[in-house]
Amino acid sequence: MNNAVRGSLPTLAILVGASVWGLIWYPLRILASLGVTGTLASALTSLVAFLFVIVARHRTIATLRWHWVLPGIAVTAGVTNLGFVWGTIHGEVLRVMLLFYLTPAWTAIYAHFLLRERLTWAGAGLAALSIGGAMLMLWSPTLGLPLPATPAEWAGLAAGLSFAMSNVLVIKASRELPEMRAEMRTATLFGGAAVFGAIASLFEGIPAAPAGGHLGTAVLIIVAIGVTMASNNLLVQYGLARVPANRASIIMLFEIVITALSAWVFANELPSAREWAGGACIVLATLLSSRVHRAAPAPDKPGDGRDAARAMV
């Protein structure tokens, strides 16, 4: 393998990871059509992902340490996964995704209080830009208020809030527990998502098992999604550890492109001009945030790209 190909592999890893996250909503809808609810799908796919990480990276289990931040990571990962899965199953995929992508605004606020990072004027401006984009997208002449109009959109918003918190807590864990490998933080994320999804499914009621041949199909899809989630996280961690943070953030935005295209092809969802404009503000804020925060720790210190994980599909 020549140097040019080897050098492009980390970028390709992030690109593939973003594409997978942009497409994963579709098999979740197939599961829903087979009778597997969003909460149950969240629990089962996360359980498969958790087991996959534990088995594939079993040598890192010895680095697991206790800290109060780990339950926080587990809970926020659970809310993130459940909100994203439920929202993309029951709502307009692109709108849910864009509400989720308000993450930079919430991250700036959380990091100020939990990581003692100074909230600069630039950071506050980017937060305002992304929130303004969401208000533009959500504004309706009939409703009069720029608020999520459906439970699915509220779920997407909650997922973004929780994802931002889980990101901040993962960074804090990497600082407090530098000896704990990133794979164990990823396992904590998936384990928390599995437990939270299982608890939530109890309140939703136990659905009837898919009948006949549908049961085998549902099991195969659940296992495939879970393994894909875990593999995708490990793949993206490989890329983020070797690509500058500002460049990686730009590549990750490809997820929105894939989401928009797949929503158009598979769900016949076409955003309005106002939704495109609001989405553009959110994407721009995400893009610029990588430049505002481009002063990242050195790759051999805690908090580098290897700490990045996403316990959601």
Residue ranges and their predicted role:
Residues M1-L15, A108-L161, I171, E176, ...:
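Juxtamembrane helix-loop boundary signature in multi-pass membrane transporters
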Residues A4, A49-W66, G132-L147, G192-A218, ...:
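Membrane-interface helix-cap regions at the ends of transmembrane helices
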Residues L9-A13, G38-V55, L129, W154, ...:
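Hydrophobic alpha-helical transmembrane segments of multi-pass integral membrane proteins
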Residues S19-G35, L82-G91, L99, F113, ...:
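Juxtamembrane C-cap of transmembrane helices in multi-pass membrane transport proteins
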Residues L23, T60-R95, L136, V227-V243:
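Specific transmembrane alpha-helical segments of multi-pass solute transporters/efflux pumps
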Residues L31, A41, G87, L99, ...:
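Hydrophobic/aromatic residues within transmembrane alpha-helices
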Residues R57-H58, T103-A128, V257-W276:
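C-terminal transmembrane-helix exit sites in multi-pass transporters
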Residues L98-L102, A173-G192, M229-V265:
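Helix-helix packing/entry segments at the starts of transmembrane helices
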